[in-house]
Amino acid sequence: MYTYMEYLQKCFFHATRWNEDNIYSNITASSHALLEFLVPSGLKMDVSSRSSPNSASSFTLSNHHSLNGSLAYMYSSTQLKGTPGTRRIPLQDAIAGFKIVEPNEMRPSASGTIAPSSLLYGRMYFPGAALEAMVIRRFSPHTQLLIKCIHNPQLDKNGTLIAYFQKNTQRYSREVIYSTNDALVGFRGLYNIGSTPSWSPSPPNFDRSVVSVGAELWYAARTMSPGLSTGLRYSTRSTSTGKPLTMTLACNPILGHISSTYTVKTSVASTFCSRYDFNLFSYASNLSLGFELFNFDKNAAVERNPQLPTPTTNPSASKQNLINPIRDHSYYQTTPSTNATTYQSSQTISDSFQKLVNRSEFSSVVKVSTSLNDRLVRLLWEGRFKDFLVSSGVKVSLNPATNAVELNRFGISFSYAS
């Protein structure tokens, strides 16, 4: 579950038309959210408040091993309107999960230009003297500077700083990165094949397949250590059901590591993910599986678009249609005519499925992931209780020596924002 400050940062990117999916570091974000989700440890309470449309503050208190907490403040030069508190925030926006990849969603604003904007963030931890800060400066609709720094007396030279200069367009994205840790210099790039060009006036087609190819290159000047990785992402939608799926392939030639993932949204309320890791040098392999299942809010009904015809289905099958919204809908039946008619029909199906997902209201979600080689299971429940967002989970594994079940992690987290 995102913290409220992380949620506001995503709202800032959305308000300034910045597409996070088009960044190389997020190429496996969907599979990571379903397989490597973080389980809370101990008891944690997070309270946030919006003092104005441009600023927010947050207070966090936890008792993991010892009592500690933090104070955070965020300021945005762009007003973050339409950002509700935890009582009204959609559960899909508050939780990291499957993300439909749409490189074309980065469209210009109504005025055609985006004014330069900034976001400032700082957090102070106690007890101790640890500090962290972040600065985001948008120079143009396609370029921004992101700076992150940490000050901690326990770190080498009391802290580190990392800067990203990013250029993000519909066709490609590039990043130049520098870190004071070992004088690390890096370059990342991602290129989309099959997306609509930036000069095209046509709107994006949600059912169009997009192939994204990227790579990153690192070099640590102090230790003279190189780093290299490549990645490929294929995103598409089923023309018969409109359900999206994403496949990725990542490779680290230096370490000989290959990782492939397959993530599919099997229904409006469920997503399945699998990942297979293999090492070319040691021949070690691992299979990881995970899924998420949302629970519909019984007190909220799914809104329908009045412009769409009413489907000719049995009312008793309405709950079943939420699992497969395309079945039994005569409006979505396609007829084998011309290619243009078939394309428009498949586009309507994809668009209808996406609208149903966006308009569905959920009360909670259950996430489960397991790894065969690591022999561990993660279980996480996230949902809404009164005006709070609650996250509770457990992580268990088998002891390799005794085969006994061990409890590695357990906790519960409460989040409130007004």
Swiss-Prot record:
Subcellular localization(s) per the UniProt record: Mitochondrion outer membrane
GO biological process, alphabetically ordered: establishment of mitochondrion localization; mitochondrial genome maintenance; mitochondrial outer membrane translocase complex assembly; mitochondrion-endoplasmic reticulum membrane tethering; phospholipid transport; protein insertion into mitochondrial outer membrane
Protein name (record): Mitochondrial distribution and morphology protein 10
PANTHER family membership: MITOCHONDRIAL DISTRIBUTION AND MORPHOLOGY PROTEIN 10
Keyword annotations of the record: Membrane, Mitochondrion, Mitochondrion outer membrane, Transmembrane, Transmembrane beta strand
Disulfide-bonded cysteines: none
Signal peptide as annotated in the record: none
Source organism phylogeny: Eukaryota, Fungi, Dikarya, Ascomycota, Saccharomycotina
Pfam families associated with the record: MDM10
Membrane topology value: Multi-pass membrane protein
Function per UniProt: Component of the ERMES/MDM complex, which serves as a molecular tether to connect the endoplasmic reticulum and mitochondria. Components of this complex are involved in the control of mitochondrial shape and protein biogenesis and may function in phospholipid exchange. MDM10 is involved in the late assembly steps of the general translocase of the mitochondrial outer membrane (TOM complex). Functions in the TOM40-specific route of the assembly of outer membrane beta-barrel proteins, including the association of TOM40 with the receptor TOM22 and small TOM proteins.
Lineage top rank: taxon: Eukaryota
Family of this protein: Belongs to the MDM10 family.
Entry remark concerning the domains of this protein: Lacks alpha-helical transmembrane segments, suggesting that it resides in the membrane via beta-sheet conformations similar to those predicted for other outer membrane proteins and porin.
GO (cellular component) term, any one: ERMES complex
InterPro entries per record: Mdm10 (IPR027539)
UniProt subunit comment: Component of the ER-mitochondria encounter structure (ERMES) or MDM complex, composed of MMM1, MDM10, MDM12 and MDM34. Associates with the mitochondrial outer membrane sorting assembly machinery SAM(core) complex.
Gene name linked to the record: MDM10
